[in-house]
Amino acid sequence: EGGAPFPPEARRGDAWTGFKRGWRDVSMQVAQGRAVTPFLQGKAVGGSTPINGAIIHRMPQRIHAAWADRHGLGETLPYDALDGIFDRLDDELSVEPTPEAAWGGNNSRFKQGADALGWTSNPTRRAVDGCERTARCNQGCAAALKQSMDQTYIPRVIQEGARLYSECRVERIIEASGRA
């Protein structure tokens, strides 16, 4: 991983400290093109997952189809094979629609407006196991309820024998005898 571990107990400080610890360039990166666009990138163990909103979307079929045409993804991983993978990830990461009790005023009003206009709306699906609504998702969940990679899969693979190197920059991966 490019950054250092950012354990939940270190996520209790102010926003500035959270941004310095969790975000590459203190969340001030931009991608330049026709427009300058903020480009947020995590730098802690777990990448961006410790400091994002834990929003989980399933890959739309139209995106898969485009990647299948452009990059040959369809031959390697057909779209219908993804359903079981998505279901397993949802189960392992506690992905479910955000409960109404956690919406807050803005989201509740948005839902009321959508209903009044006859629009269909759905709560965002998030990987959180019992959100406490601290509103610190982008600084890192101090309660360790967000199912980020540093809280879920990384400890699991370490327990199974993987080694984690933090604060390292990977320039290439050498594979030999089935190991990287």
Name each model feature, range by range.
Residues 37, 108, 151-152:
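Residue-level marker for well-ordered alpha-helical positions
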Residues 28, 119, 162:
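Short glycine/serine/threonine/alanine-rich loop segments
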Residues 9-17, 125-128, 142-145:
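A broad, low-specificity signal for short, low-complexity segments enriched in glycine/proline
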Residues 42-131:
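Rossmann-like flavin
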Residues 21-24, 122, 146:
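Acidic, His- and aromatic-enriched active-site or binding-groove loops in soluble protein domains
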Residues 27-28, 52, 98-99, 141-142:
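A generic structural signal for short
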Residues 113-116, 127, 132-180:
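Helical element adjacent to the flavin cofactor pocket in flavoenzyme catalytic cores
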Residues 1-67, 79-80:
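N-terminal glycine-rich phosphate/pyrophosphate-binding loop and immediately adjacent elements
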